[in-house]
């Protein structure tokens, strides 16, 4: 897939998520991020989730790590910013 197309799809997904959160979530609220990332990229995820309560779990084959981060956020914009920062990490999957 063309990187420009991928970026457009991601921007649209985050825009829709923000709309849903603004309509359904009362802020401040605790939010849980979950990402799966290759072991070689885990340090990048930890930087994005810095300051959160973090949990890491390695996959059974040891190639991937599931990283969760939990924190209280004051707005949907703060949450979307985390997703945007994470989206540039090679091989990341947001759950």
Model-derived features: positions:
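Short, hydrophobic beta-strand segments
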Residues: 65-69
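Long, contiguous binding/interaction regions
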Residues: 1-64, 74-95
């Amino acid at each position: 897939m063309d990187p420009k197309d991928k970026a457009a799809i991601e921007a649209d997904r985050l825009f829709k998520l923000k709309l849903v959160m603004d309509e359904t979530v009362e802020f401040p609220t605790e939010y849980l991020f979950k990402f799966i990332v290759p072991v070689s990229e885990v340090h990048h995820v930890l930087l994005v989730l810095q300051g959160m309560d973090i949990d890491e779990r390695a996959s059974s084959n040891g190639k991937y790590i599931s990283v969760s981060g939990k924190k209280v956020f004051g707005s949907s914009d703060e949450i979307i910013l985390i997703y945007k920062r994470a989206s540039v990490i090679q091989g990341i999957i947001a759950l």
